[in-house]
Design a protein with these regions (language model features):
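HotDog/MaoC-like acyl-thioester-processing domains
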Residues: 2-27, 83-92, 100-158
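Active-site helix/loop of acyl-thioester processing domains in fatty-acid/polyketide metabolism
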Residues: 46-68
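Small beta-barrel nucleic-acid-binding modules, principally OB-folds
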Residues: 71-86
């Protein structure tokens, strides 16, 4: 019995679409020996620092103006992480980041981390999924506020 299907061709997951509501970026993490633990892989707590680096790079890439922290702040109110497989010292780590939703005062950010085992692009697999909830912060008033309008437009893709 023959099949009309083409032979299977492994797809690099970095080439698959990322379901975000607006712009997304791929951010490569520079792994350091201090990120590793005694088991020879990235320590679970380090991933949240990686998410922060990727989120800042994404924010800088997609907001239309230089971010003035003194006027428009954001606070992290929730971080989540699903670990799928370890990242080791000779691997490359790429984090895809974008918005998954937005409320009046909050921005939901999602991440997919891809490990290139041994640094090889042809050996790329999903390593983790993460999410962060941010709230917009009025630094002068010291309280939560509506997401800054220019951010709202670009982050939502509008």
């Amino acid at each position: 019995m023959s099949s009309d299907l083409p032979p299977s061709d492994p797809v690099n997951p970095l080439r698959l679409p990322f379901d975000s509501m607006g712009p997304s970026i791929d951010f490569e993490v520079t792994l350091r020996y201090s990120d590793m633990d005694l088991f020879g892989h990235v320590n679970n707590a380090k991933y949240f620092s990686f998410l922060e680096e990727a989120r800042i790079a994404w924010f800088e890439a997609c907001v239309p103006e230089k971010w003035d922290f003194e006027k428009h702040g954001v606070l992290v109110v929730r971080n989540e992480m699903d670990y799928i497989q370890p990242v080791k010292p000779n691997d490359r780590l790429i984090i895809r980041v974008g918005a998954s939703g937005m409320g009046n005062t909050s921005i939901n950010v999602k991440y997919e981390g891809f490990v290139m085992k041994g640094g090889r692009e042809d050996n790329t697999e999903l390593a983790f999924r993460g999410a962060t909830t941010l709230v917009s912060w009025d630094t002068e008033a010291g309280k939560v506020c509506r997401v800054h309008e220019p951010w709202r437009k670009t982050i939502s893709g509008g």
